[in-house]
Amino acid sequence: MYRNWRDLISPKKLQVESESLTNTYGKFFAEPFERGFGTTLGNSLRRVLLSSLQGAAISSVKIKGVLHEFSSIPGVTEDVTNIILNLKGVSLKMHGNEARTVRIIHKGDGIVKAGDIVTDANVEILNPDHHIATCSKDANLEMEMVVKLGKGYVPSDRNRDEKAPVGTMPIDAIFSPIKKVNFTVSNARVGQMTDYDKLTLEVWTNGSVVPEDAVAFAAKILKEQLSIFINFDEEAEPAEEAETEEERERVNENLYRSVDELELSVRSANCLKNAGIKMIGELVSRSEAEMLKTQNFGRKSLNEIKDILADMGLTLGMKLDGFPDPEVMRRIRGERKDEE
C-alpha cells in the first residue's frame, strides 16, 4: 500500500526567481509533478494564501466631533465615508497579538497620509504615503483607530464593539496580507517524457510578510488540515511484509545478479548499458526520476523494469547500505564456480 505515494514523482525543492524577488513579490517554480498535481496544488495554495493568512488592519475609527459615517468634517475635503475608505487602504504590520489604538492629530492645511498615524512599537505602517485626507487651514482632525489581527475579509458588523465609546464606527477590514496570487501549469520534462506538470506560482503581498514565508505558511495550513485523513504513523512506516532470513538472503543475491539476466527488451537493455548499470543492485538504487533522465529511456521501459523487479521483491529507489559488499560478491562468485 505504501507504493501509493512512494512511486509518485515529486519535486526535490522549491525554486525562486531571485532576480525579481522583493519583500512584496515572489515568483516560484516546482517540478516535476505527476499530471494533474500542478493544478490541484496551485489552486489549493492560491485559495489558502488569499483567505487564511493572518494580517493586521484598522477595524474601527472614532473621529472627534463625528457621530456617524454620513457626516462631514469642517475644513476637510473628504467626507467621513471617503476617509473610512482611505483608512481601509492603510497597510500595517503588528508585532503582538493584542489590539492596539493608534491616532492622527492634524491641525491646519495639508495632506494627511498614513505616515502621520501615531503608533507604538507594536504597530508599523507599511505604506506611509497612502492618502487619507486633505485639510484646509481651519481644519482640526483628530482620530482614534483600533488595529487588530485577523484573517480574510471581516464585515463592519462583526467588528462592532458594544463597549466602545459613543461615535466609534466599525470598518470593513481586509486582514489578508496577500494582494494577489497567480499560478500557471506547464509541461515538465523527465527524461524523454513531457507529460509531467511544472507549477509556477506568483505572490504579491503588502510587505507585512515576505512571499517565501507566505507560501510556506499556506503549505503548512494545508498540511495541518489534511493530517486528520492520515490513519497511520508517518514516523515509522512498517515494511509491507516481514522478511524471513531466507527471503532476505535471496534478495541480497538478486542484487548481485547481472541486469542481462532480467531478459529485458533490446531498447531497455541498451539504455541500461549506456547508463553503465551492470548489476541489479545498481539499478534498484536509482529512482524513477533518475531513470527517466537516461537517454532514450521512456515510460514503457520504466514500467517493464518495475514489473520485473516487483516479481523479485525489489523496487526502484531502494536505499542499499554497503552495496556492493565484497564478501557477498566473493561468496556468489565461488558458488558460481562450483556450479561450473
Swiss-Prot record:
One Gene Ontology molecular-function label: DNA-directed RNA polymerase activity
InterPro entries listed in its UniProt record: DNA-dir_RNA_pol_insert, DNA-dir_RNA_pol_RpoA/D/Rpb3, DNA-dir_RpoA, RBP11-like, RNAP_asu_C, RNApol_insert_sf
Region Alpha C-terminal domain (alpha-CTD), residue ranges: 251-340
Any Gene Ontology CC annotation: cytoplasm
Top-level EC class: transferase
SMART domains per record: RPOLD
Catalytic activity: RNA(n) + a ribonucleoside 5'-triphosphate = RNA(n+1) + diphosphate
Gene Ontology biological process terms from the UniProt entry: DNA-templated transcription
Alphabetical keyword list: DNA-directed RNA polymerase, Nucleotidyltransferase, Transcription, Transferase
Family assignment from sequence similarity: Belongs to the RNA polymerase alpha chain family.
Domain notes: The N-terminal domain is essential for RNAP assembly and basal transcription, whereas the C-terminal domain is involved in interaction with transcriptional regulators and with upstream promoter elements.
Function: DNA-dependent RNA polymerase catalyzes the transcription of DNA into RNA using the four ribonucleoside triphosphates as substrates.
UniProt name for this protein: DNA-directed RNA polymerase subunit alpha
